[in-house]
């Protein structure tokens, strides 16, 4: 049978709620030990997978603009003092940097999977860069 989307409907009477048994009511009304409710925690990896799906759907830049701009200006100071940048130039640099990093992390993840692991490590990133020919 095909699934259909469930929509909320206004109640038009129907059955009255059943009364709870005495033991159930006593259990619910009695305070639990300590009285402090633990905060809800997801299983390890659940939030990570949710974030992966969210970021794969999105197209916005992930590195904050101002810290990236400060870093670019700091690096540029080593080459020439009093350099000025158009905002579009810094935007283009940021797009290129993020595209490079996403590709590097994809290759790093493949290296970790090849080693039968799910966690990326420093050696995976080193191998990915070496295979790309960026570092010998």
UniProtKB/Swiss-Prot annotation:
The modification N6-acetyllysine is found at residues 10, 15, 19, 24, 28, 37, 57, 65. Its main location: nucleus. Keywords: Acetylation, Chromosome, DNA-binding, Methylation, Nucleosome core, Nucleus, Phosphoprotein. The modification N6,N6,N6-trimethyllysine is found at residues 5, 28, 37, 80. This is Histone H3.1/H3.2. Phosphorylated by IPL1 to form H3S10ph. H3S10ph promotes subsequent H3K14ac formation and is required for transcriptional activation through TBP recruitment to the promoters. It comes from Candida albicans (strain SC5314 / ATCC MYA-2876) (Yeast). The nucleosome is a histone octamer containing two molecules each of H2A, H2B, H3 and H4 assembled in one H3-H4 heterotetramer and two H2A-H2B heterodimers. The octamer wraps approximately 147 bp of DNA. Residues 1-43 are annotated as: Disordered. GO terms for molecular function: DNA binding; protein heterodimerization activity; structural constituent of chromatin. One of its GO terms (cellular component) is nucleosome. It comes from the Eukaryota. The keyword Acetylation applies. The keyword Chloroplast does not apply. The gene is HHT21. Belongs to the histone H3 family. SMART domains: H3. One of its GO terms (biological process) is fungal-type cell wall assembly. The modification Phosphoserine is found at residue 11. Core component of nucleosome. Nucleosomes wrap and compact DNA into chromatin, limiting DNA accessibility to the cellular machineries which require DNA as a template. Histones thereby play a central role in transcription regulation, DNA repair, DNA replication and chromosomal stability. DNA accessibility is regulated via a complex set of post-translational modifications of histones, also called histone code, and nucleosome remodeling.
């Amino acid at each position: 049978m095909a699934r259909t989307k469930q929509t909320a409907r206004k109640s038009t009477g129907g059955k009255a709620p059943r009364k709870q048994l005495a033991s159930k009511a006593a259990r619910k009304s009695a305070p639990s030990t300590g009285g402090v409710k633990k905060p809800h925690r997801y299983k390890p990896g659940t939030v990570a997978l949710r974030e992966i799906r969210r970021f794969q759907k999105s197209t916005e830049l992930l590195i904050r603009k101002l810290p990236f701009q400060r870093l670019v200006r700091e690096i540029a100071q080593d080459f020439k003092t009093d350099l000025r940048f158009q905002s579009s130039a810094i935007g283009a640099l940021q797009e290129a940097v993020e595209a490079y990093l996403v590709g590097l992390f994809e290759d790093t993840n493949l290296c970790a999977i090849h080693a039968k692991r799910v966690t990326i490590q420093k050696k995976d990133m080193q191998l990915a860069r070496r295979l790309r020919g960026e570092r010998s």
